[in-house]
Amino acid sequence: MKAFIAVLGTGMALAGMVAGVATAAQPGGPGQIARGQEKYEYWCATCHAGDPREGGRYLPGTASLNAKYKGERPGALADRTDLLPPYVKLVIRRGMEGMPFFRKTEISDAEMEDIAAYLARNTKQ
């Protein structure tokens, strides 16, 4: 009986975790996405904008992602369809490869949530 209760408890915990991940992966509403776009333009687009600059060159973040994915995924973050909010938030706070991290004094938790919602808006669930 104890083994059954332990298995049942583990199963319920896993179900709760899966439900929590599914809920966390949903992008926010129109207001949050609009705020996220504004913050993305200010903090992120300086390196990750999708349009080429003078001379046809992309910005450093977009260029490095274009080279990394070799056409399998867009280099421009705003064009991606595979970004989940938890991943976006992790990269904002910890940085990645050549990208710096951002402190809470630079991008607040609320702003980070908005940016994550904006970048996840096209993600297929």
Where are these regions (language model features)?
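N-terminal export/targeting leaders of redox proteins
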Residues: 1-30, 123-125
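Periplasmic/extracellular electron-transfer cofactor-ligation site
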Residues: 30-31, 37-76, 90, 98, ...
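Axial heme c-ligation environment in periplasmic c-type cytochrome domains
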Residues: 70-83, 87-122
